[in-house]
A protein has these predicted regions:
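Terminal RNA-binding accessory module
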Residues: 1-43, 47, 329, 336-337, ...
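Short, conserved phosphate/pyrophosphate- and ester-handling motifs at nucleotide-, phospho-/glycolipid
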Residues: 11, 136, 259
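Extended interfacial segments that mediate partner engagement and assembly in macromolecular machines
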Residues: 31-43, 49-158, 178, 193
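Flexible loop/N-cap segments at domain edges
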Residues: 171
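Structural signature of eukaryotic scaffold interfaces centered on beta-propeller domains
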Residues: 174-176
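C-terminal lobe
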Residues: 181-190
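Rossmann-like S-adenosyl-L-methionine
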Residues: 191-452
Length: 452
């Protein structure tokens, strides 16, 4: 039986207390470290243990990359049942620190009634008061300290999750790595803050890089950070940044990769796998704001993107127009519906890129993709387990796994991305005369599909 023990490293000799036993594995707690592993290093963060963000700050980066590579391999072997996996070396990050361009800090009351702001402890909503985070740029630290000072002077109330009272809920910040622009967003349980002019003054003095200060109004009893309504206190409610030579406008609500440098590495690998020559139709399913597809649009004859969130589709359309991309269209709808509608209207994309959420693809999506018979499918995954499950169906639908590359988008954390190249076993022909299993697609609703 495997025993998972947080805070340990491969090669440690230690005393462990088993605290929870399940059917196939157990959880333990480190009681005493007898002999440290050669992979161990001194954590560079004072709250590395209790904070729920990083889990690998106590080991070397080389060891972290080995763990993440093995995690992908284990999932493909154990869940997918694959052997002789064509794994390529993991794409490690050039830096383990200061790589995040977004930060959201929950706000609460300490036992002595003062504001605390930071990150949630492991598996809880208990806030660990934090004045710096090594994953985020130093400019966020300065903005957070100015915000703390303003709260003390203004006396603005702190949100109480249990009572659903008080005003200040989160401090949410974004920055453009290339543009240098900074957006500060105060998430509030109400439309008005005490001392708004003072807040603007203190933030601008502490952080000259700030280009916008907004209030996000969230009056709901919810764990969702942002509400729908924004009010601008100063400047503009968006920032700009450049990714793969394209410029994107980013609002508090917009999806944008939090590690721009590694996002470019991932997109470049996806483009390499796509193998575009300029003659192909490219379908980008789960396209979000269009970043992956738009980064490849200049190498394709035609780009079609599909996304379920209307605001994201609108952002994708704006991003295409802003970057003078004229060979793209975007559909708003569920991936299953979008794939089926595109199939029925006769679209037979040569290359399909899919970047689904953590839950992976609906089985009907994979069935329709297989019916379209693209020569290549590029699968970008944020969860090795659902990736393995979906690849199992793809191989059953006449696709081969040609290459697998893990990508470390979030150094220090447990997360790992993966890019997979799938090729059709018989690339000639484009699905004419194929019959799709209607039982897998019976829920398709054309009325929910629309062009953006």
């Amino acid at each position: 039986m495997a025993v998972f023990v947080p805070g340990t490293a491969v090669g440690d000799r230690c005393v462990v207390r088993v605290v929870k036993v399940l059917k196939k594995y157990a959880f333990g707690r480190l009681e005493e470290l007898l002999t440290p592993s050669p992979d161990r290093t001194t954590p560079d963060c004072s709250i590395a243990g209790p904070c729920g963000g990083c889990v690998y700050r106590h080991i070397t980066y080389e060891a972290e990359l080995k763990i993440k590579t093995q995690r992908v391999r284990d999932a493909l072997e154990r869940i997918g049942g694959f052997e002789n996996i064509p794994m390529e070396p993991i794409l490690g990050a050039p830096s383990r620190t200061r790589y995040r361009n977004k930060c959201q800090l929950p706000i609460g009351l300490s036992k002595n009634g003062e504001m605390q702001m930071g990150f949630y402890a492991v598996n809880s909503h208990r806030i660990i008061d934090t004045h710096t985070c090594l994953l985020q740029p130093e400019v966020f630290d300065r903005a957070a300290e100015a915000f703390r000072a303003w709260q003390k002077l203004s006396g603005e109330s702190i949100y109480d999750e249990a009572a659903h009272s008080g005003v200040l809920r989160h401090l949410y910040m974004r920055c453009g790595e290339k543009s240098g622009e900074v957006l500060v967003c105060i998430v509030a349980n109400g439309a008005k803050l005490h001392g708004e002019d003072l807040l603007v003054k203190m933030l601008r003095e502490a952080v000259p890089e700030i280009t916008g200060i907004v209030v996000n109004i969230n009056r709901e009893r919810t764990n969702v950070v942002l509400g729908r309504e924004l009010r601008t206190l100063w400047g503009k409610p968006t920032i700009r940044d450049t990714l793969c030579r394209l410029e994107f406008e980013i609002s508090p609500h917009a999806f944008y990769q939090v590690n721009r440098t590694q996002a470019e590495a991932l997109y470049n690998k996806a483009a390499e796998y796509a193998g575009l020559t300029g003659a192909e139709t490219l379908l980008d399913l789960y396209c979000g704001t269009g970043t992956i597809g738009l980064s490849m649009a200049s190498r394709a004859k035609k780009l079609i993107g599909a996304e379920i969130i209307p605001s994201a589709v609108e952002n994708a359309r704006k991003n295409a127009a802003h970057n003078h991309v004229t060979n793209a269209e975007f559909l708003c709808g569920d991936a299953k519906d979008a794939a089926r509608i595109l199939y029925e209207r006769g679209e037979r994309p040569d290359i399909i890129v899919i970047d689904p959420p953590r839950k992976g693809c609906d089985a009907a999506v994979i069935t329709t993709i297989a019916a379209m018979r693209p020569t290549r499918v590029v699968y970008v995954s944020c969860d090795p387990a659902t990736l393995a499950r979906d690849l199992k169906q793809f191989t059953a639908e006449n696709y081969n796994i040609e290459a697998v590359t893990p990508v470390d988008m979030f150094p220090g954390t447990a997360h790992v991305e993966t890019v997979v190249l799938l090729s059709h076993k018989k690339p000639d022909g484009h699905g004419e005369g194929l019959v799709i299993n209607e039982s897998n697609l019976e829920d398709t609703d054309k009325s929910r599909m629309k062009k953006a």
